[in-house]
Amino acid sequence: MNYIYELPMKVRDYECDLQGIVNNANYQHYLEHTRHEFLLSAGVSFAGLHEQGVDPVVARINMAFKTPLRSGDEFVSKLYMKKEGIKYVFYQDIFRASDGKVCLKGIVETVCVVNGRLSDSELFRSEERRV
């Protein structure tokens, strides 16, 4: 996969459950944070978009858990994106930094709501050309 963005992160204690591994819900936070940081790297603020009446929202998400992360683990969240009709599809994978093992493979489908209405968006056109 030709990733277009990477974000290193580290697991915090409170993200782990009783089994000592990252709770599954926190992976969705990691993916969302990566998308927001990707936007910022492209010069776009998620909050700024909302103020302009543009709200990218998740329509569907699929996460396949491969190798658990534990407290203190460093990892890299990687992203690839493509446009399919009015959707932007983000292929997001998380890798443990210490050994490169795949921890999660995710596919996140997003759409844009513009002034309260589902709409096609040119939001990532410049980024899409890079892929």
Predicted features along the sequence, with ranges:
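Hot-dog-fold acyl-thioester-processing enzymes
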Residues: 1-58, 113-130
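HotDog/MaoC-like acyl-thioester-processing domains
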Residues: 3, 65, 70-71, 80-130
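Short alpha-helix capping/helix-loop boundary micro-motifs
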Residues: 60-64
